[in-house]
Amino acid sequence: MLECENLSCTRNNKVLFKNLSFKAELKSKILITGPNGSGKTSLIRSLSGLLPPVSGNIRHCGKDIYDDPKSYISSMVYIGHKNACKDSLTVAQNVEFWAGIRNTRELIVAAICCLQLQPVLNIRYGELSAGWKRRVALARLLISNANVWLIDEPFCNLDSATCELVLNLISIRSEQNGIVIITGHSSTEQLCDFTTIDIRNFNRLLV
């Protein structure tokens, strides 16, 4: 379980949200919604261990993620707006690099096949379209073999077919006792089975 208790976060001395609490049980799919600048990215970065909250606690399996970061990082994968890929490397080299970090080289073929990356494997990442770049970055979900997926706007720059593919991967991960938390501007019909947290509800608590 991933549990947040009374989280507050600031950016440039401005409070983004305050006293935000929720629990993500195994098999959870959670959508964090809100307009640009409302704190969605800051929240998911806090959940990833990259941005300590001003106050409150985040616990994974009962342990504060900031007290035991190594244990948490090994069970979590975070994909932000920046795709964290090297432009000078080919797609294949990027995938191999991630697998080397996670010691999961046995998952390379499955990740390539699931994200249908075969046509671009030998192309430098920097030469790809925005859609292909995002698809390559999402391969990290499978390469990581992580139980917790944190994805900031996963469908950005993707066509409808790839969006459906990613939704299927998310469903499979959650069904396998995973936890998936994503951000988006609003809920849609395709995301109707996600538990929605509107971050604006916690913006209104500011004093």
UniProtKB/Swiss-Prot annotation:
Tell me the membrane topology, using the record's own terms. Answer: Peripheral membrane protein
A biological process (GO) of this protein is: cytochrome complex assembly
Which reactions appear under catalytic activity for this entry?
Answer: heme b(in) + ATP + H2O = heme b(out) + ADP + phosphate + H(+)
Residue ranges constituting the ABC transporter domain according to the UniProt record? 2-204
Entry's localization field = Cell membrane
For this UniProt entry, what's an example GO CC term? plasma membrane
List UniProt keywords, sorted A-Z.
ATP-binding, Cell membrane, Cytochrome c-type biogenesis, Membrane, Nucleotide-binding, Translocase, Transport
- Residue numbers binding ATP: 34-41
Entry-linked SMART domains: AAA
Assigned EC number: 7.6.2.5
Q: Gene3D superfamilies, per this entry?
A: P-loop containing nucleotide triphosphate hydrolases
InterPro entries recorded for this chain?
Answer: AAA+_ATPase, ABC_transporter-like_ATP-bd, ABC_transporter-like_CS, ABC_transptr_haem_export_CcmA, P-loop_NTPase
Give the main location: membrane
According to the UniProt entry, its GO molecular function terms are:
ABC-type heme transporter activity; ATP binding; ATP hydrolysis activity
Does the keyword field hold Phosphoprotein? no
Per its UniProt entry, which superkingdom is the organism in?
Bacteria
Q: Mind telling me which PANTHER family this protein's record contains?
A: ABC TRANSPORTER I FAMILY MEMBER 1
Purpose: Part of the ABC transporter complex CcmAB involved in the biogenesis of c-type cytochromes; once thought to export heme, this seems not to be the case, but its exact role is uncertain. Responsible for energy coupling to the transport system.
Family the entry assigns:
Belongs to the ABC transporter superfamily. CcmA exporter (TC 3.A.1.107) family.
How does this chain assemble?
The complex is composed of two ATP-binding proteins (CcmA) and two transmembrane proteins (CcmB).
What protein is this chain from?
Cytochrome c biogenesis ATP-binding export protein CcmA
UniProt gene name: ccmA
